[in-house]
Regions:
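Long, charged N-terminal interaction/targeting segments
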Residues: 1-89
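Cys/His-clustered metal-coordination modules, chiefly Zn-binding fingers
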Residues: 75-138
């Protein structure tokens, strides 16, 4: 199988194996970035030679500016691996990144929802409940 066909297979594999919804974006450097899950859980960057799998993460740079800072889980040189080995390894990396991300969620003591860490106001209180229960001002 030639490289362009394999590249398209990788795209199809990612779109069907990442947690939905999957947002696919072409980047200026020619790579394809996939951000999956709601809220975001896994970030995958696909280049002409490698697949980088990361756990979604980020920081609030200001009160209104959130900057994504994915945490790398693993990189695969997809041209060097046989198809079965590549897809098996990629599935494990995606599963690991998702599990790492979900393990950081916290349950809000007011509403009981499992909430991404960037949307927690304090330990145990999500931002939405903090606005309602404590009069937080933004």
């Amino acid at each position: 199988m030639d490289a362009p066909e394999r590249y398209e297979q990788l795209i199809a594999f990612l779109e069907s194996n990442l947690p939905p919804p999957v947002d696919r974006q072409e980047t200026p450097d020619g790579s394809v970035q996939f951000i999956s899950g709601e809220p975001a859980e896994v970030v995958v960057s696909l280049t002409e030679t490698s697949v980088l799998v990361s756990e979604f993460s980020g920081v609030w740079e200001s009160q209104f500016t959130f900057a994504a800072r994915p945490r790398r889980v693993g990189v695969l040189k997809w041209r060097r691996l046989q198809e079965t080995a590549l897809f098996n390894a990629l599935a494990v990396l995606i599963k690991g990144a998702r599990e790492m991300r979900l393990s950081r969620f916290q349950v809000c003591r007011y509403c009981g929802r499992s909430t991404a860490p960037e949307w927690m106001h304090d330990d145990g209180v999500c931002q939405a409940c903090a606005d309602q229960h404590s009069g937080a001002i933004h």
